[in-house]
Swiss-Prot record:
It catalyses: a fatty acyl-[ACP] + phosphate = an acyl phosphate + holo-[ACP]. It is found in: Cytoplasm. It comes from the Bacteria. SUPFAM superfamilies: Isocitrate/Isopropylmalate dehydrogenase-like. The gene is plsX. Transmembrane segments: none annotated. This is Phosphate acyltransferase.
Length: 351
């Protein structure tokens, strides 16, 4: 943990490219004026230098690392790994590997980011596949959901590893001593769900892990805030996340239309507290919870939404800052070791 962390940024990733990155750092400076950080911007100097010149406060906390090579959003992971050396994404991750930076943020190609991250940083011992986390707003704070897209299919062992990583991640980002953990299922009864989910449930119970496991939970439990960490495969998690984002935009649109539907509605809206309306807007705006961590790598890799604007990218930077300052890597170790030992004993007993 460092007093002033350095965050490495793939400045060429995402739909909006360098403009969103520079604007994002500016928003982060305004949103968290007490957070001191420096940024390594990996990208094309011809594009980044003019943007930094227009934002002197951003330029003051940034160091530009020039490269004209970038990973395209359409690149397949295998192709990206072969061609990515020297790219903005590769160099940004390499800065974490070398110890120059405590975390890396990218809005680029998710598959490529994961593949390159695995090549450069390698997987943590005891983790077979990385998982992408998402911070889900609830009336009680936030629920961590994983996986939300890294693995379309998972086996029971991988789901247990996700539970271990998600629990440690929740403690690192949101605090608390014993966040509750649940497996997403179609019902809470023991016989509900597919074989993989039921097997994962039994593995968690038998392994005697140091987590507050609550058993099966259902989709409606996520937004209620009754569970801190929700574990699922990437196929299910991604659909749930995208559905929630779409619903949030729909409801936000309804609220906006209701407050502007007539002169009387506009006058009533004007009487409401502007602060309250702003807080409501932020709670319903996916940009303010943008950013997921690729858990399981030997380094902090934060994935920003590919379409994130400056406000959204700032949220991903904020998450990277918190993770860089946390002891997540140490917190995850004990339960991974305990589960690995349990699996070895199970294999030995079966042989």
């Amino acid at each position: 943990m460092t007093a002033i962390p350095t965050i490495s940024v793939d400045a060429m990733g995402g739909d909006l490219g360098p403009a969103a990155v520079v604007e994002g750092i500016g928003h982060a400076l305004k949103r968290w004026p007490d957070r001191k950080a420096t940024y390594l911007l990996h990208g094309d100097e011809a594009l980044l230098a003019p943007l930094l010149a227009r934002h002197p406060k951003v330029a003051a906390v940034c160091e530009l690392r020039h490269t004209e090579t970038l990973v395209q959003m359409t690149d397949k992971p295998s192709e990206a790994v072969r061609r990515a050396r020297g790219s903005s994404m590769w160099n940004a991750i390499q800065s974490v590997k070398s110890g120059e930076a405590g975390a890396i943020v990218s809005s680029g190609n998710t598959g490529a980011l994961m593949a390159i991250g695995k090549v450069i940083l390698r997987m943590k011992k005891g983790v077979h596949r990385p998982a992408i986390s998402a911070n889900w707003p609830t009336p009680k704070g936030h629920t961590v959901v994983l996986d939300v897209g890294a693995n379309v299919q998972c086996n029971a062992t991988q789901l247990v590893e996700f539970a271990i990583m998600g629990e440690a991640y929740h403690r690192a980002v949101f605090g608390g001593e014993a966040p509750s953990v649940g497996l997403l299922n179609v019902g809470q009864e023991e016989l509900k769900g597919n074989d993989t989910v039921r097997e994962a449930d039994q593995l968690i119970r038998k392994a005697n892990l140091d987590i507050a496991y609550q058993g099966f939970i259902e989709g409606n439990d996520i937004s209620a805030g009754g569970i801190d960490v929700v574990v699922t495969d990437g196929f299910t998690g991604n659909i749930a996340l995208k559905t929630a984002e779409g619903t949030a935009r729909l409801v936000a649109g309804w609220v906006r239309d209701a407050l502007t539907s007539s002169l009387l509605a506009k006058l009533a809206a004007g009487l409401l507290s502007l602060g309250a309306l702003e807080r409501l807007r932020q709670r319903m705006d996916p940009r303010y919870i943008n950013g997921g961590v690729l858990l399981g790598l030997k380094g902090i890799v934060v994935k920003s939404h590919g379409g994130a604007d400056g406000e959204g990218f700032a949220s991903a930077l904020g998450l990277a800052y918190v993770m860089a300052q946390s002891d997540f890597m140490a917190q995850i170790r004990a339960n991974l070791d305990k589960f690995a030992s349990f699996e070895e004993q199970e294999v030995a007993a079966a042989s």
